[in-house]
Swiss-Prot record:
Record's function text: Could be involved in insertion of integral membrane proteins into the membrane.
GO cellular component, one term: plasma membrane
Annotated PANTHER family: MEMBRANE PROTEIN INSERTION EFFICIENCY FACTOR-RELATED
Protein name: Putative membrane protein insertion efficiency factor
Topology in the lipid bilayer: Peripheral membrane protein
Family of the protein in this entry: Belongs to the UPF0161 family.
Amino acid sequence: MKQVLLGGIHFYQKVISPMKPATCRFYPTCSHYGKEAIEKHGALRGGYLTTRRLLRCQPFHPGGLDFVPETFDWKAPLQRENPAEHQK
């Protein structure tokens, strides 16, 4: 399952993304975030983190720095209160 998800992200990055203008509100981009999340936390947890990230990547969210967490917690809030926490 992990390889299927990573293959989908790779396809998006190489085929679809170059045809679109850059619109991601975050750094790293959502596709890079998804790739790292799945590699670091596996298909289920990484897929969950990626889905949460994609739901936040919309015009009503300010975006900013949002790195894949080192540890995974199902109960973690959907968004950290202080994006500067990522810069530590």
